[in-house]
Amino acid sequence: MMLGVIADDFTGASDIASFLVENGLSAVQMNGVPKQPLNSRVDAIVISLKSRSNPANEAVEQSLNAYNWLQENGCTQFYFKYCSTFDSTAKGNIGPVTDALLEALNEDFTVITPALPVNGRTIFNGYLFVGEQLLSESGMKNHPITPMTDANLMRLMDAQAKGKTGLVAYADVIQGAARVKERFAELKAQGYRYAVVDAADNSQLEVLAEAVAGLKLVTGGSGLGAYIAARLSGGKKGTNAFTPTKGKTVVLSGSCSVMTNKQVEKYCEKAPHFQLDAAQAINNPNYAEELYQWVTANLDAPLAPMVYATVPPEALKAIQNEFGADKASHAIENTFAQLAAKLKRYGVTNFINAGGETSSIVVQQLGFSGFHIGKQIAPGVPWLKAVEEDIYLALKSGNFGKEDFFEYAQGMFV
């Protein structure tokens, strides 16, 4: 059986791909929907889209295109991968995409499990937690694109999907896969189309991986993907992951998450750093060139130069109020994209990126068709190597990694 993964952003794609490889599957990550058939044999194909914050109709179209290609290339079970903090409001697209994939597969039931306990994302009684905080009380309530003000996954799903969402509670999950499958049958009989499944630690994800073996569509974060991979590989562990070659390196940080703010603050103590100015990104057509000149002048420093748009919540709100959230974010993303392209032409070979939107736009601009999956820098954040040439990327979702992430990643160079 070949697993086909449809990921709604690039950091999410590398997140789940790293867990698949770590748990014994051979996998390749594709940058968007390929135009040609896959010419290598693998256990899993991960397609990375840039659809997380898109209007529902656009996300559905992208996801169905990915599904069709995966099916044509031999995949028989499909995994819709979204963020472990859900990142989808009432206007979001997780519900519509899930519905579209169910209909394409002629199926009427699937699971909703964004849990990733290794990074503090757990589900209890259908509520999503980030560490000890409810999702709605965490830093995600201030997300610039998808502010998460409700932690109840049943309500979140019902607000955006066609069907009803039920719960497989912790008390059922700890009884094992047979009981979970019984609950699936009970919920289906009661007219539920989706089941949020509690997962307070990895043992519940291991149970769920067995319970969903017969489902053609599974949805969730990378945590469940890891245990599906472990089941498919028979518990084999991946051993051939690479680390990057030392070379010209840059850090680009666009995330405004709580952890990325801490990581940026810590890195600023040791490395050359330049804070991207939103007004300049919007109004100055030469801004990317000015940033490029600064980066290239600092490439010989002991630690890589960093360009960052990362700011605390209060500063982010001020930027959004002054310029508009969409206008500011698009200008900043476009500046990062132009800068990355210039730096690649200059000879930069290692790109460390923080933030899903930043990573997505940088990868699109660099134009690679796919990536080999390397060693993990942190859970869910592997090194990637472009299939076309020796360019290495780290694509970090906002809240992933420890405070020393940027320096630690460079310590892995060989």
From Swiss-Prot:
GO terms for molecular function: ATP binding; kinase activity. InterPro entries: 4-carb_acid_sugar_kinase_N (IPR010737), 4-carb_acid_sugar_kinase_N_sf (IPR037051), NBD_C (IPR031475), NBD_C_sf (IPR042213), OtnK (IPR050007). It comes from the Bacteria. Pfam families: NBD_C, SBD_N. Its EC number is 2.7.1.217. It is an enzyme of class 2 (transferase). Keywords: ATP-binding, Carbohydrate metabolism, Kinase, Nucleotide-binding, Transferase. It catalyses: 3-dehydro-L-erythronate + ATP = 3-dehydro-4-O-phospho-L-erythronate + ADP + H(+); 3-dehydro-D-erythronate + ATP = 3-dehydro-4-O-phospho-D-erythronate + ADP + H(+). SUPFAM superfamilies: YgbK-like. Belongs to the four-carbon acid sugar kinase family. Catalyzes the ATP-dependent phosphorylation of 3-oxo-tetronate to 3-oxo-tetronate 4-phosphate. This is 3-oxo-tetronate kinase. It comes from Actinobacillus succinogenes (strain ATCC 55618 / DSM 22257 / CCUG 43843 / 130Z).
